[in-house]
Amino acid sequence: MRKKILFVINTLSRAGAEMALLELLRKLDKEDTYELSLFVLMGQGEMIDQLPPGVHVVNERYIRTSVLEENGKKQMYRTIRHAAAVHGNALRLSVYMIRALGYMIKTKRIQPDKLLWRMIADGAERQNETYDLAVAYLEGGSAYYVADHVNAKKKAAFIHIDYTQAGYTRQLDRDCYTKFDAVFPIGENGEKKFLEVYPECKSYTHVFHNVINQDMIRRKAKSYGGFSDNYDGIRILTVGRLTPQKS
């Protein structure tokens, strides 16, 4: 009997963690031992068509637009408004959000998006299935949703950031990572920083490097186009987002 695994991610738009998840799912899909499901918390993202055929998307509704496009932003705001109305979340979580905002002001790290993830997670669709493993592939909403709203025999969470710089706190998390059976930072520095915040999670925190399709990168490197000057030496290109939370 195949093991049932649910992955949860905030959106499926074009970004590093999402690309790494797609590659991991492709590898797992080649094995016949897993029944793979995916829940996209915000229910949107343009990379849905790149999922391997064996992955079942459990969202009742899904919009194939990027959160960076104008229509995608409008859909994102609608999702947030809906989450605020479900279960009286806006009122029920008001004290939590005020306290979290107060801490952000005190530490001079005001990041409104971090305040909304709890409300979005609490207002998202619920899954009736019980899984062998549930995986929160991102911090924030995905982690809160898996910790509090998914039935699973085992739960795991990935950490893609420097947790001390990303704007999250134990108060904001409600200590959600103590509810997981495994935590996987994607690098050694990420592991070190996470354990500064959650030292009691050390026994089940292990580095899990992102899965990268090296053949695809080499193939694209040889594709037509590129620099038009006459330089024939070695070029080194780094692509990334330079923000404090990147570990």
Q: What is the predicted function of each stretch?
A:
Residues 85-133, 141:
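Conserved nucleotide-sugar donor-binding subdomain of glycosyltransferases
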Residues 113-123, 143, 160-179:
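Nucleotide-sugar donor phosphate/pyrophosphate-binding loop at the beta->alpha transition
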Residues 14, 32-107:
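N-terminal strand-loop element at the rim of the active site
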Residues 14-15, 214, 243-247:
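A short, basic/aromatic alpha-helical/loop segment that forms part
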Residues 122, 174, 217-231, 235:
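A short helix/loop element that forms part of the nucleotide-sugar donor recognition site in Leloir-type
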Residues 5, 133-139, 144-163:
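Active-site proximal beta-strand in glycosyltransferases
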Residues 6, 227-246:
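Conserved donor-binding/catalytic core segment of Leloir-type glycosyltransferases
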Residues 154-160, 164, 178-219:
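Donor nucleotide-sugar binding/catalytic pocket of nucleotide-sugar-dependent glycosyltransferases
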